Amino acid sequence: RRSSDLFHDVGKTKELSAFPENDYTDDGQLLGHIIIGTEMVGERIRTIAGFPEKTASELKHCILAHHGELEYGSPKKPALMEALALAFADNTDAKLETMTELLKKAGDNTQWLGFNRLLESNVRKTTV
């Protein structure tokens, strides 16, 4: 559970090809990083003698639910406090990264950056 933050995107290592291509692999296209990561963690857990089944299920649930909503690609909605916290953190990270990229691309004299679908807002630079 506490390690879910470390492993929630591990499937991206097999979802995407190496740089410089960094393109989707066949499994990336067909399964996606959430399913791939859940399988990778499950395979590793099976090699650890005595690993608690309940902990394994909770860790895999956190990975499966880390996008938070079905419409965002999560096969499961968060059912554990840790899964909900991870989903909030992952969503916040994605939105802050989007905002950072928008600000980097904006000209010095640009105030309004336009509507962003992920942020669901017309974005403006702050003066604070």
PLM regions with names:
Residues E15-D26, R46-G107:
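Histidine/acidic-rich helix-loop-helix segments that form or flank divalent-metal centers
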Residues R2-S3:
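Short, small-residue-biased leader/transition segments that mark boundaries at the very start
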Residues A87, K105, N109-R117, N122, ...:
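N-terminal intrinsically disordered, cationic/polar leader segments
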Residues L6-D9, L31-L70, L118-T127:
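Histidine- and acidic-residue-rich, metal-dependent catalytic cores
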Residues F7, G11-K12, D93:
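Short active-site segment of divalent metal-dependent hydrolases/proteases
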